[in-house]
Regions:
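A short, N-terminal "cap"/entry segment at the start of jelly-roll beta-barrel domains
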Residues: 1-42, 57, 107, 111-164, ...
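Short acidic-glycine-tyrosine-enriched beta hairpin
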Residues: 81-96, 201-222
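Structural motif
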Residues: 74-76, 99, 109, 193-195, ...
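Asparagine-centered strand-capping/turn motif at beta-strand->loop junctions
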Residues: 102-105, 228-229
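Short, charged beta-turn/beta-strand-edge "cap" motif at the junction between a beta-strand
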Residues: 98-101, 223-225
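A short hydrophobic beta-strand segment most commonly corresponding to one strand
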Residues: 93, 107-124, 218, 232-250
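Short, conserved beta-strand element in jelly-roll/cupin
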Residues: 47-50, 60-77, 167-169, 181-200, ...
Length: 264
């Protein structure tokens, strides 16, 4: 609080300093990859971690659209004066150039994923709650031993992004293998443990990796990318950048879960 001396001159109160310990940041952003480091053309991916009570400074992506995914804890996303609750698996589309932020109103650490891709156009904000999508059969794709939830589908406005979640039963796998000539992807593993392959052809297959919670795998154009669940159910984000479709909606053979590898 300011005060004045006998001459009427305003004397500014001196404020105390604060000590911020190394490693004690209330908001942390981890950039997992950009297009160059992921061998991609479009996608970038990162993760926010907010301690209880933390508030993130607003950020904007001047040349990119983005999707924000609730993972651990319950966050609040703030955009255009509105507040959106991000519980587990909720998704929020951030239009190109729009400033947004996160806050953590709870007592536990919050973790939130973000994927981004270049955009030329500004599309409407879209908020997708998993509690609603998981009951909407128009947004669910049932396959053998796994279920896909279309959280941000082609019906929503965007330049490049489409995204959802895949839930695998224990000891199940992607089948048939498929690749894309006009899409790149990232898989972000949220729950369970499994493995994943990324390859151009079986003859050149060398990328075989175990995947755990918090791992992300990039899938450049033309690569097959099967996933294998192990003894636990497996949940992951799939985010596409490029032509806007989901493989099972474009090629119905994929939904049968049989046959030869599929290229779209």
């Amino acid at each position: 609080m300011d005060s004045s001396d006998d001459s009427g001159v305003i004397v500014q109160a001196v404020k105390p300093g604060f000590l911020f310990r190394s490693g004690g940041a209330p908001v942390i952003y981890r950039e997992h990859f950009a297009p160059g480091s992921g061998n991609l053309e479009f996608l970038s991916c990162g993760e926010y971690e907010l301690q209880p009570g933390a508030v993130m400074q607003p950020v904007a992506y001047p040349e990119e659209e983005a999707l924000v995914y609730g993972w651990r804890g319950r966050a609040h996303a703030h955009l255009d004066g509105n507040r959106y609750e991000l519980s587990e698996y909720d998704v929020l589309y951030i239009p190109k150039g729009r400033a947004w932020s996160l806050s953590n109103p709870g007592s536990e650490t919050v973790r939130v994923w973000v994927t981004r891709a270049p955009a030329q156009n500004v599309h409407p904000v879209f908020y997708s709650q998993f509690a609603a999508v998981s009951k909407d059969e128009s947004r669910i794709r049932h396959l053998k031993s796994r279920t896909v939830y279309m959280m941000f589908d082609v019906s929503e406005g965007a330049d490049k992004l489409v995204a959802g979640y895949s839930f695998f039963d224990p000891y199940s796998r992607s089948w048939p293998p498929h690749n894309h000539t006009d899409q790149e992807e990232v898989y972000i593993f949220l729950k369970g443990r499994g493995s994943m392959e990324v390859y151009e052809s079986p003859e050149t297959l060398s990328f075989v990796r175990e995947v755990n919670e918090g791992d992300a795998v990039t899938i450049p154009f033309y690569n097959y990318h099967p996933v294998f669940a192990q003894e636990l159910p497996l949940v992951f984000i799939w985010c596409i950048a490029g032509a806007r479709y989901w493989v099972g909606d474009k090629n119905k053979e994929f939904m049968k879960g049989t046959g030869e590898p599929i290229t779209t």
